Amino acid sequence: MEKKRIYLFCSAGMSTSLLVSKMKAQAEKYDVPVLIDAYPETLAGEKGQDADLVLLGPQIAYMLPEIQQQLPGKPVEVIDTLLYGKVD
């Protein structure tokens, strides 16, 4: 089975890096076939083309319409602020 690509985009990176690590650990634990990576928001239009799912950190939620426009047909969602803050 081909792995799905989940790409997270944010402005700072530290919290997102922690979240990516936890997501990768859970995917491995439950044998979920995904590749998860994080990038700065400046690469959303470029890197997002290769993603199956694009997640945005809450600090760049204001960019949702712009990124959706750059990635027509791609699912783009903002990570819930509470879950993001808990790195859960």
Swiss-Prot record:
Boundaries of every PTS EIIB type-3 domain copy: 3-88
Cross-referenced CDD domains:
PTS_IIB_chitobiose_lichenan
Task: Cite the EC number.
Answer: 2.7.1.205
Q: GO CC annotations?
A: cytoplasm
Q: Name one Pfam family in it.
A: PTS_IIB
Which reaction is the catalytic activity of this chain? D-cellobiose(out) + N(pros)-phospho-L-histidyl-[protein] = 6-phospho-beta-D-glucosyl-(1->4)-D-glucose(in) + L-histidyl-[protein]
Key words of the record: Cytoplasm, Kinase, Phosphoprotein, Phosphotransferase system, Sugar transport, Transferase, Transport
Main localization (coarse): cytoplasm
At the top level, the lineage of the source is Bacteria
User: In which compartments does the protein localize?
Assistant: Cytoplasm
Keyword tRNA-binding assigned to the entry: answer is no
Any single biological process term in GO: phosphoenolpyruvate-dependent sugar phosphotransferase system
* Gene Ontology MF term list: kinase activity; protein-N(PI)-phosphohistidine-sugar phosphotransferase activity
Active-site residues from the entry: C10 (phosphocysteine intermediate)
Q: What class of enzyme is it?
A: transferase
Q: What does this protein do?
A: The phosphoenolpyruvate-dependent sugar phosphotransferase system (sugar PTS), a major carbohydrate active transport system, catalyzes the phosphorylation of incoming sugar substrates concomitantly with their translocation across the cell membrane. The enzyme II CelABD PTS system is involved in cellobiose transport.
The record comments on the domains as follows: The PTS EIIB type-3 domain is phosphorylated by phospho-EIIA on a cysteinyl residue. Then, it transfers the phosphoryl group to the sugar substrate concomitantly with the sugar uptake processed by the PTS EIIC type-3 domain.
Record-given protein name: PTS system cellobiose-specific EIIB component
- Organism encoding this protein: Aeromonas hydrophila
Gene field: celA
